Amino acid sequence: MQNTDRKRNVAILGSTGSIGCQALDVIRRNNDLYAAYILTANNSADQLIQQAREFQPEAVVIANEEHYEKVKEALADLPIKVYAGPDSLCDVVTDSNVDIVLGSMVGFAGLRPTISAIKAGKYIALANKETLVVAGELIKQLAYDHHVPILPVDSEHSAIFQCLEPGNPVEKILLTASGGPFRKYSPEQIATVTKDQALAHPTWNMGAKITIDSATLMNKGFEVIEAKWLFDVSPDQIQVVVHPQSVIHSMVQFEDGAVKAQLGMPDMRLPIQYAFSYPHRLKSDFERLDFFQLKDLTFERPDADRFRCLALAYEALRQGGNMPCIVNAANEVVNLAFRQDRIGFNDIASVIEQTMQKAVFTRERSIEVYLDTDAEARRIAEELIAK
């Protein structure tokens, strides 16, 4: 249970991204309870400067050192410490005044700072799903060893967390998915999809990388892996349910057959706020769900033949070891390549699958293994794209 007799200091890893910006809005609306203590960005220097001037954090980090002088100069009139480089991300989260670390960086880059925060005993609000995809077993053990709670920020995992009942085992997790913009496309149509079509997500406001992952259903595959580590269930206990309206954020089925669901408007600020305030709920003026305005709620099975990435994620989870790390690295490479018009939509799954076959498999788990695996899988994926 959180101590709420003073403002809680939040370190936001990735404050200029979609989740980071929405987290700052939560802090803005609850500035009597939370303070943005540390803000970080990779390349978005102008936005980081703007955020720093509004929220007056203790420190900011610009991970790309090329932007250091620009940020330092722009904030020279304020008592804000300015750091640069990836190692600084790992350092700032250990500050004794930091209460909550929101991991909202995109991709593998979020792993090392999250590990540093866990080792420093910080309360973790986790939006960076790749951390658990790549190193779920290691992260879970570290969190256990350091008595650190990990609160999910993903809307689906937040929903599942809210549905759980202590002492009542889960029979099945029903993980909902919008199905993406190509849910009804034929295989022929999917083959010709463009990046502009893929970047137009029907429901959620997200960054470019995760929007493409949602279109391929790799995002949902990663959420399956994330759910396994967060909720200690087997792959066979996680069922993906396509629910295009995104009103039901996920469901839990118990051993007696009862199903609990968490519903709400698709607004990421709600799970962010809940992760900050747990076990309490804060009053908000977020849009309410109006049941009388709801159209039909529909449910479908996902098509793993048309959307191979979902099947590949399940396969990686069943294999275990460093295979999810291989999939994540290859996916980061092909996702960017697709956004750069270097490959077609169907090449995304093809390159990932070939990388899974070529990369060295190991069951060892350490940060060094994951770093080596990540580098090797990226190299293989780049070589496959270049062919």
Predicted regions and their residues:
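Catalytic, metal-anchored helix/loop core of enzyme active sites in primary metabolism
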Residues: 1-387
